Amino acid sequence: MKTKREDIRNIAIIAHVDHGKTTLVDELLKQSGTFRANQEVAERVMDSNDIERERGITILSKNTAITYKDTKINIIDTPGHADFGGEVERVLKMVNGVILVVDAFEGVMPQTKFVLQKALDMNLSVIVCINKIDRPEARPEEVIDEILELFIDLDANEDQLDCPFIFASAKSGYAMADLNDEKKDMQPLFDCIVNNIPAPEGDPDADTQMLISTIDYNEFVGRIGVGKIDNGSLKVNQEVMIVNHHDPSVKKRVRITKLYTFNGLNKVEVNEAGIGEIVAVSGIADIHIGDTICSLNNPVAIPFQKISEPTLSMDLSLIHISEPTRLQLI
């Protein structure tokens, strides 16, 4: 019988370059108490890849987790470019909702649309966070209209069109449910997440099922599979069956040697984890994205989200010259 994990929320963050999603997550980490008051928080904590730090874009998804009151909030950063579509779709498979971060001056930008379209297609709940409202040229009311127009263009359903709006300055450390509210802290955003993002659900008594959505690597333990437990539970030293996503008839019996959950930016070893939790497992040398970790007695794979094929677009034109020239593909 399916039950909800009311103590967990799983969300992804969508934003255009430089609209402030990394600063927003940094501030949530600080104000949730995930980082101690005397602990230094590195700038751009979610930009772990060298190219990401240099360019300010997100290519690989990162996992972090914060605790607000009695609720654990797993936050996953998403790539913003259509070029990394496969990464986007795999990430969204793990969450029940998204936070759309939009600059209060720049408004909706092209990089936002691709990921938002995927989220809407998967019927995920949406919270819109209009960030940088402290900019002198901020125009939040106009940006609200732009966002609603975008939702309509992307065929959002009625519930998605009725999504909550939060107004924030991540840099200054505050969020508001209304533009006239007091500029105090990030609590309005925390409350909005807990109240509007559905809790993950699954059957804790059913056979174990966990879809591997991303792969991490550690030089000491090797490949690490990351995903959400959809049904059942996982334990250290538990024997499970890996079902190959290309051919469900290919199965391999393995043992979970280490099991991790996330706290802040760290992986924390645990002995057991249940439905709705985003976890990492090690000890499986040839685990791959799209594989399903299953119970031995009922190895049923979870359908793998169809990944958009990489695309390359090119515009070619001839320069006006007096004599015809042959255009050759080299």
Regions found by a protein language model. Give the residues of each.
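Conserved nucleotide-binding/hydrolysis modules and their immediate coupling elements
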Residues: 209-314
